[in-house]
């Protein structure tokens, strides 16, 4: 449907997506699946899950691409797809990094004090 409405995004290097609803649904679902592996208390899981669910609900509720772009407030729908891809990539990295675990060693006493 997006291909019928516009021929270009107007952004260099960013091609028009013919199936933005399908693409966003897949990306948001994959992100939510990865977040299920995080502990429930992890801040990244809590807030990313909330935002991703809100965006997924918008994608499911609004069939018109232009209205969806306005709802998501992320620019062109292709830019939103790019953001969703980056969030999925970050979620995978965060799962590997495990930032919710305690530090391996204690930080120096005045690490965050400035000026020293």
Swiss-Prot record:
InterPro entries: NDUFA5. It comes from the Eukaryota. The modification N6-succinyllysine is found at residue 98. The keyword Protein biosynthesis does not apply. It is found in: Mitochondrion inner membrane. Disruption phenotype: Lethality around embryonic day 9 (E9). Conditional knockout in the central nervous system does not lead to any visible phenotype until mice reach 10-11 months of age: then mice become lethargic, lose motor control and have difficulty maintaining balance. Defects cause loss of other complex I subunits and reduced NADH dehydrogenase activity. The modification N6-acetyllysine is found at residues 30, 36, 46, 60, 98. PANTHER family: NADH DEHYDROGENASE [UBIQUINONE] 1 ALPHA SUBCOMPLEX SUBUNIT 5, NADH-UBIQUINONE OXIDOREDUCTASE 13 KD-B SUBUNIT. Accessory subunit of the mitochondrial membrane respiratory chain NADH dehydrogenase (Complex I), that is believed not to be involved in catalysis. Complex I functions in the transfer of electrons from NADH to the respiratory chain. The immediate electron acceptor for the enzyme is believed to be ubiquinone. This is NADH dehydrogenase [ubiquinone] 1 alpha subcomplex subunit 5. The gene is Ndufa5.
């Amino acid at each position: 449907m997006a291909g019928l409405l516009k021929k270009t995004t107007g952004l260099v290097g960013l091609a028009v997506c013919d199936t933005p609803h399908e693409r966003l649904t897949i990306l948001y679902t994959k992100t939510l699946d990865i977040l299920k592996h995080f502990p429930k208390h992890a801040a990244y899981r809590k807030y990313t899950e909330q935002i991703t669910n809100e965006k997924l609900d918008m994608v499911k509720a609004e069939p018109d691409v232009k209205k969806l772009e306005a709802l998501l407030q992320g620019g062109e729908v292709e830019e939103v797809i790019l953001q969703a891809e980056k969030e999925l990539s970050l979620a995978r990295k965060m799962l590997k990094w495990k930032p919710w675990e305690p530090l391996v060693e204690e930080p120096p006493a005045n690490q965050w004090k400035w000026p020293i």
